[in-house]
Amino acid sequence: MVQKKKFCPRLLDYLVIVGARHPSSDSVAQTPELLRRYPLEDHTEFPLPPDVVFFCQPEGCLSVRQRRMSLRDDTSFVFTLTDKDTGVTRYGICVNFYRSFQKRISKEKGEGGAGSRGKEGTHATCASEEGGTESSESGSSLQPLSADSTPDVNQSPRGKRRAKAGSRSRNSTLTSLCVLSHYPFFSTFRECLYTLKRLVDCCSERLLGKKLGIPRGVQRDTMWRIFTGSLLVEEKSSALLHDLREIEAWIYRLLRSPVPVSGQKRVDIEVLPQELQPALTFALPDPSRFTLVDFPLHLPLELLGVDACLQVLTCILLEHKVVLQSRDYNALSMSVMAFVAMIYPLEYMFPVIPLLPTCMASAEQLLLAPTPYIIGVPASFFLYKLDFKMPDDVWLVDLDSNRVIAPTNAEVLPILPEPESLELKKHLKQALASMSLNTQPILNLEKFHEGQEIPLLLGRPSNDLQSTPSTEFNPLIYGNDVDSVDVATRVAMVRFFNSANVLQGFQMHTRTLRLFPRPVVAFQAGSFLASRPRQTPFAEKLARTQAVEYFGEWILNPTNYAFQRIHNNMFDPALIGDKPKWYAHQLQPIHYRVYDSNSQLAEALSVPPERDSDSEPTDDSGSDSMDYDDSSSSYSSLGDFVSEMMKCDINGDTPNVDPLTHAALGDASEVEIDELQNQKEAEEPGPDSENSQENPPLRSSSSTTASSSPSTVIHGANSEPADSTEMDDKAAVGVSKPLPSVPPSIGKSNVDRRQAEIGEGSVRRRIYDNPYFEPQYGFPPEEDEDEQGESYTPRFSQHVSGNRAQKLLRPNSLRLASDSDAESDSRASSPNSTVSNTSTEGFGGIMSFASSLYRNHSTSFSLSNLTLPTKGAREKATPFPSLKVFGLNTLMEIVTEAGPGSGEGNRRALVDQKSSVIKHSPTVKREPPSPQGRSSNSSENQQFLKEVVHSVLDGQGVGWLNMKKVRRLLESEQLRVFVLSKLNRMVQSEDDARQDIIPDVEISRKVYKGMLDLLKCTVLSLEQSYAHAGLGGMASIFGLLEIAQTHYYSKEPDKRKRSPTESVNTPVGKDPGLAGRGDPKAMAQLRVPQLGPRAPSATGKGPKELDTRSLKEENFIASIELWNKHQEVKKQKALEKQRPEVIKPVFDLGETEEKKSQISADSGVSLTSSSQRTDQDSVIGVSPAVMIRSSSQDSEVSTVVSNSSGETLGADSDLSSNAGDGPGGEGSVHLASSRGTLSDSEIETNSATSTIFGKAHSLKPSIKEKLAGSPIRTSEDVSQRVYLYEGLLGRDKGSMWDQLEDAAMETFSISKERSTLWDQMQFWEDAFLDAVMLEREGMGMDQGPQEMIDRYLSLGEHDRKRLEDDEDRLLATLLHNLISYMLLMKVNKNDIRKKVRRLMGKSHIGLVYSQQINEVLDQLANLNGRDLSIWSSGSRHMKKQTFVVHAGTDTNGDIFFMEVCDDCVVLRSNIGTVYERWWYEKLINMTYCPKTKVLCLWRRNGSETQLNKFYTKKCRELYYCVKDSMERAAARQQSIKPGPELGGEFPVQDLKTGEGGLLQVTLEGINLKFMHNQVFIELNHIKKCNTVRGVFVLEEFVPEIKEVVSHKYKTPMAHEICYSVLCLFSYVAAVHSSEEDLRTPPRPVSS
C-alpha cells in the first residue's frame, strides 16, 4: 500500500497448541481443539481467531498406527490469516508431530482399512517440512507414498530413531505447535517451535529415563499428555510440574521478545544456552533491499518447471482465478506466496489464501467469489466437498502432477512478449541450474545455510571460500545457494517487467491527480500501449489490470526501492538480498535471552537426546516433490482416506473456546521477564517523519538499558554510559531510515567478518554469508550491451562523499525526441524536458526510458524542472527518479547550460522556453544525435519559431515557405507550448496574468491572420499527437483555446462611426436605460479604462488605433454581397425559431470590455443597443437590447484557457452538429447572439433589468452565484469583433481575399473547416490529465511526492484540510475550463456531461467543488460557446522569488539558489536540483546582519534545532521576502497550529552543584527554581544558548560585573528548552518590533 504498514510492537502474537484432548483410536480424524494458548488474554487489535485450529490441522486431527511413524514424525508449514476489514496479514508457522496415546483395549478392527487410510492421512498432513533455519524453507523432504518406499536410514538424520520406532505398536495422534505473528520469520519461528518441542522431550527423558520397562517414547509422550492437558497434573511428581512451569516461563519470555527495526536493529535471541545452539537472529531488510521472503521462492519453478510456472504467472497477472492443490501443505502454501512475491514490483490486489483447510465448514464458498483470487487447497479438498462444483472460470494447478488445468470456458492466455520472455526463461533456468553447479565444494547447501559444520570446508583456508572458478558462471548468479537463486529469480522478474514491451517507461504515462488525503493517479493506457515497440495482447491486457493501475499510485511513495536498484544494474545479493546474512553485520544488535541459565532445564539439555535434531532437513533445496512419480498424484487411495474422514463427522464450524480448558499451568505474571525499558522507543518509528528519515544509521552497537532479570539479558557492544540516552534517542527516531547500501567491494569480506563475530565455541556455527562470485561485470554482459541496450536503463555514476549517504551526480537532462518526424530538427525539439533522478544510488528512471532516450544527455537545465530528494530522502537511501516537467509560468525561469557546446546563443534561446508536459517516449526508435548536436538543433528550432512568432506579431504572417517546417516542429509538445506562450499576449505582464478573469486582447487584422495560421498548424499537430495515442502530451490545447477565445480583431471602424449610438468609450452607465444602476466604484472604473494588452508596438499601431482595411479589401468585400444575403436567410430562420423564448444578439464580449475596465468585477452592467448596427447586424437583422451574464472562475496553470460562445456562421455541417444540444435547435440562435453582462445583485434588485432575461437566462445567474461568485464579463458592442476561435470553426470568411488565401493555404493541409479532433472524447480526457500534471508542476505540488505526503501526515487537521482544498480547487478549475472549451468547440453536450462526470469521479473532488461542477453540468443545455467564463489558474497567482546565496558566511561557500515559495523556502543546487526544502512551520527564527550580509535561519530538524547561515548581497531583500511570505502563509491558516506552547517548564540538573530543579521559560526571561535558591535571568541578559550532548548551555551577561557567565544544566529535554527559548525570542521580536533597536535579540546556536 502507499501508506506504510502499521508497526507491530510484538514479535510473536500467540503461541498455541492444537490437537485432540481425548484422541480416539477408532477414527482416522477428529475435530481439532485448542489445547493450550499463550498468552491467555487477547490482544486488543488482534484477538486470537478461533478457527486457527483448522489451519493448524487442515484435514482434522489425525490418528495413525505407530508403524507408520517410519515416515518423519514432524513436519512444518505456513499459513496466513488476513483480516477482511483492515487487510492486515498475520502469519502462522506450524509444526505438526505425532504423540502417542495408549489404547486400553487392543482393537484390530479396521487395521487394514483404517490403518491404510491413516497411512495416507499421515502423508497428507506430515509429508512436508520446511528446512533451512536461516535462509529458506527448503528442507522439506517428501517421501513417495508407495508401500515399499522407506527412507534411507543412513542419509536421514532421524534414521536411528525411526528404525527403533518401527516395531512399536501404539497409536499416535496429531499435535500442532503454532506461532502467530505479524512478521514472516518463518525459519526462525520454526526453529523456536522445534526448540520448544525439544525442551518438552528432554524433560521427559531426564525425569523418567531411568525407569526400567517403560519404552522411552512413552515417557516422552507422557510429558506431552500432561502438557496438552490430557493427564491431570496432580497425578505426577512435583519435579515434573516444576519443569513444565519452567517451560511455560520460557514461552512467556519468548512472547516478550523485542522487535527488530528495519535497516537499524537486529534481535539476537538465545532460546538455548550458547554452547547448545547459537542465538537466532531476527532482522528485517531496509527498503532498498527486497522484502523478506523466508522461504524458497524458486519452489514453483522446481515443482512445475519454468514454462508451466510462467503460464501460472500469466494467469495471476491477468487477474484470472487460480487454485493450487497439493498433498504437501508446505509446498502448497509456499508456492502460493512465491507466486505473489514474484510479481514484484506489482502487487496482487485480490484475495490470497495460501492454505484453505479441508475440514473448515463452508470453506468452498470462497471459491465462488466473483473477484480474482489465488487459493491453495489440500488434495483432499474437492473430494471432501462432495456437493461443491468448481466454477468454470478457475485455473487449477496440480503441484503433485506438475499440471496446469485450464477451465472449460477459458480464453486463450496471451503469450508473453518476445524477446523478453525468452530472456526471462533463460535467466530463470540459469538460476535453477546454478544450484547444481559444482563451483564450490559444498555437500549440503541447506546445511551450509543452517550454519552447520561442513567437513570439506573446514580444512580450507578462509580466503579459499572466496576463490571461485570463472567458468560456467552466469553474471546474474552470485552463488549456488538457494538464497542467491531466489534473489536471481526476483531480479529476473523485475527485469522482465522493466523491459521495453512490458512496463518500461511506465511512469511517463501516469498523471498524478492529487496526493491528499491519498494519492490518486491516472494511467494513460492508450499512450502507454502506443509507446511499446511491439504491440502484444499481453501488454494490452496487463495495462488494464488493477495491479498496474495501483502501481502508479504506489510508485509515488514506494515502500520498497529494490526494483530501482535493479533498473540501475545492481544485482549483487549483498546489496539487494533480503536474508539477514547479507546485512545483519551492519545492524545494531539487541541481545535477548529467553533461556534462563539458572533453570534446571540445563540438566536435561546438557545430555543430548538419542536422536538428531528434528529441525535438521534431509535435502538441499525445497520440497522434493520433484521426486514423485506419477502415482503420487493418483487419487484412488486419497479418495479412500477422504471417505474415512467423512465418516468421522468432523465439526468444521468455528469452535466456541472455553478459556479454562486451555489455561496455562503457570501464571504469566509469575515469570521473571525484564521489561525492556527503552524497547518501545527503539522499536516504534518516530512520529516525526523528518526525524525518522534524517538521523544517521546506527552502524555500531549502542548501549541500551541493561536487564535486571537474570533470565533476560539485553546488552550491547558499546558500554559508554554517557551517550546511552542520546544513542537510544537516535535509534528511536531513526527507524525508517535504511542503511546506505554496501559497496560491492564489501562483498568478499562479509564471510570473514561474520565468522569473526561468531563464537569459536559454538557447536553449530552459523555462517551468514555464502561465498559468492564478485560482480565484476554488469548485467546484461558488456558484449551484449549494444543489442540489449534498448531494454535497459543507463548506469549513472555514484559518488560517495565522506560519511554521508551516497548522492547522485545527476545527468544533465534526458530529453525526449519528437515522435512524428525523422528530421533532426524535429527529433531534437524537446529541449527542456528533464528527468529528475532522486536516487542516491544512481537510478536511471522508474520503469526507465528506452535507450534512445538515455544514451545522450541533453545539455540544458531548467532549474524549475529538476528535483532532488531533500536531505531526509537522500539519507534515506531510497532513490526515486521521476520525470519533472513544467509548463507556462513555471516555478523558475532560470535556465542554464550544463553540458558541452553550451554557448551564449543557446542559453538565450532556452531562457525563453517553457518546458512542456512531455513524458512519453517516442514510438519510433532512432539513433539520436550527439548531445552537442541535440542542443544545437534544439536551440535552432526555438530560434526559428521565435522568429516566426515575432513575424506574426509584427503583422507579417507565417510565410508560406516556412509553413511546412513550422507544422513539423509543432508536432513536438514542448515547442507547441513554447510557441503558444509567445503568442499569448495575455500572459506577457505579471499583473495581467494574475487577473481573476482573462480579458480579451485586441490585435490587428494582419496579426490575426498570422496567429490563426499558427493555431491551425498547432491543431494539425495535435491531431497527429492524438493519432499516436497522445504521445508527447496534449496539454497545449488549453493554451491554444485560451488564445482563440481572447484574441480578436475589430472590423470596419469607419462603419462603426456611422452608427448613431456608437460610443466606444462611453460608459454603459450613462445610457438612460441603465441610469442609476452602476455603483460609484464601477463608474470610476469606467472613466479610467484599464486597457488590455495589445500587440507589440512593432505593428506601428498605438493602443487605441484600430486595424483598417485597404480599399482593395473593401472591393473584395463588396463583391461577395450575394454570399452575405445567402447567409442572412439562414440566420433569420434560425433566429425566428427562438425569438419567442429569448432573443440573443450576435457576438460575445470584446475589446471595449477592457477599454471600459473590469466592469464585470463591480457593476457588470453592459447594454447592446438594437441601433448599434454594423455589417454583421445587417446580415442578421435587428435585435433588441439584451443583457446576459457569463460566469468566470479560475483558469489553468501553465495551460492557457479560453471561453467563447457562438456557433459556426453559415456552415450547414456545423449547424447539424447541434442537433442534440437543445430543443428546437436552440444552438442556432447563438449565430446571432450578442453578449451583455449584469451582476447578480443587479439582476435580483432591478425589475427592469430582470424582465429582459428570458426563462433560460434566469437560471444562469444562479449558476454564476454558486460558481465561486467570480467576476463576470463586461458587455458592449462586440458585433465588430472577430475572434480566433471563429477561424478554427471556419467562421471568419469575411472576404473573397480570405477565401482565396485559405484555398491557397490548403496546399499545406491547413483545413478551413472545423477539426474532427474536437469530437474525440479521449482527446479531451488526455488533454485534461496532461493539463492537471502541468498545473501541479507549476504550483509545486509534485516536487518530491514522498516528502509532500510525509508532511501532510505530520500536519494538523486544519492544515490537512487546506491542502486537500487546494487540490480540489485545482481540479475543479481545470474541469470547469474543460467544459468551457468543449462548449466553445461545439462538442455534443451529452458527451460533455458523461466525460466530465467520469473525470470528476476519477479525480475524487470534494463535495464543495464537485457541487459547483455539477451545477454547471445541470445547466449545460442553457449554455453555449462563451457563456461559461474561464477560471483563472492558481499558478498565475503564485509569486516566487529566487536569490543567489552562498552557504556559510562568505563567498567561499557553495552556491545555491534560494527560492521563496508560498509554503516553504526551497534551496536548489547550482544545477537546479532541490537540495533542501524548509516548511515555514519548521522555521523558528530568522535574523540577518546588513554588515556581514549573512542571513541566519533556525529550523526544527526532528527533535533538534538547526542553524543555517547564508551569505548573499541581497541579504535584506531576502529577509523581507521570506518574512512577507511567512506572514501570508500565517494569514491563510486562520488557526493555531498544533505544537508546543510558548514557554514551558523543564526538569534540569545544575552541573556545578549537582542540584536538581526546574527551568521555566517565561515572557520575561528564564526562571530557575532549585531546592534552596531561585534565580531569574532577564531576557535581555541572555547572550547565547545552545545544546551539547544533552546539556543546555546558557550564557548570561551580568551587568554588575560586566561579564558573561556560562550556566550548564543537564537535562534530557535540552533540545526542547533551546527550541522554547528561540520561540520566545521570535515572539518578542515580533511583538516589540518597534523596540528592536533598543533590545537586540540574542543569537542562539544549536550544536
From Swiss-Prot:
Residue span(s) of domain uDENN: 14-268
Keywords, in A-Z order: Apoptosis, Cell membrane, Cell projection, Cytoplasm, Guanine-nucleotide releasing factor, Intellectual disability, Membrane, Phosphoprotein
Ranges for domain Death: 1340-1415
Ranges of compositional bias, category Acidic residues: 615-630
Residues with the Phosphoserine modification: 156, 689, 692, 813, 818, 820, 858, 862, 916, 921, 930, 1059, 1110, 1239, 1270
Biased composition (Basic and acidic residues): 108-122, 750-768
InterPro entries: cDENN_dom (IPR001194), dDENN_dom (IPR005112), Death_MADD (IPR056574), DENN_C (IPR043153), MADD (IPR039980), Tripartite_DENN (IPR037516), uDENN_dom (IPR005113)
Cellular compartments per GO CC: axon; cytoplasm; cytosol; membrane; plasma membrane
Biased amino acid composition, Low complexity: 128-141, 700-712, 827-840
Residues recorded as bearing Phosphothreonine in the entry: 1061, 1066, 1237
Ranges of Basic residues composition bias in the record: 158-167
One GO MF term: protein kinase activator activity
Comp. bias (Polar residues): 142-157, 689-699, 790-804, 932-941, 1158-1173, 1189-1207, 1234-1243
Keyword Isomerase belongs to the record: no
Other noteworthy facts: Overexpression of MADD activates the mitogen-activated protein (MAP) kinase extracellular signal-regulated kinase (ERK). Expression of the MADD death domain stimulates both the ERK and c-JUN N-terminal kinase MAP kinases and induces the phosphorylation of cytosolic phospholipase A2.
Similarity annotation: Belongs to the MADD family.
Disease: DEEAH syndrome: An autosomal recessive disorder characterized by moderate to severe global developmental delay, impaired intellectual development, poor or absent speech, and endocrine, pancreatic exocrine and autonomic dysfunction, as well as hematologic abnormalities. Additional features include facial dysmorphism, seizures, undescended testes, and distal skeletal anomalies. Death in early childhood may occur. Neurodevelopmental disorder with dysmorphic facies, impaired speech, and hypotonia: An autosomal recessive disorder characterized by global developmental delay, mildly to severely impaired intellectual development, poor speech and language acquisition. Some patients may have early normal development with onset of the disorder in the first years of life. More variable neurologic abnormalities include hypotonia, seizures, apnea, mild signs of autonomic or peripheral neuropathy, and autism.
Function: Guanyl-nucleotide exchange factor that regulates small GTPases of the Rab family. Converts GDP-bound inactive form of RAB27A and RAB27B to the GTP-bound active forms. Converts GDP-bound inactive form of RAB3A, RAB3C and RAB3D to the GTP-bound active forms, GTPases involved in synaptic vesicle exocytosis and vesicle secretion. Plays a role in synaptic vesicle formation and in vesicle trafficking at the neuromuscular junction. Involved in up-regulating a post-docking step of synaptic exocytosis in central synapses.
Protein name in UniProt: MAP kinase-activating death domain protein
Organism classification: Eukaryota, Metazoa, Chordata, Craniata, Vertebrata
Gene: MADD
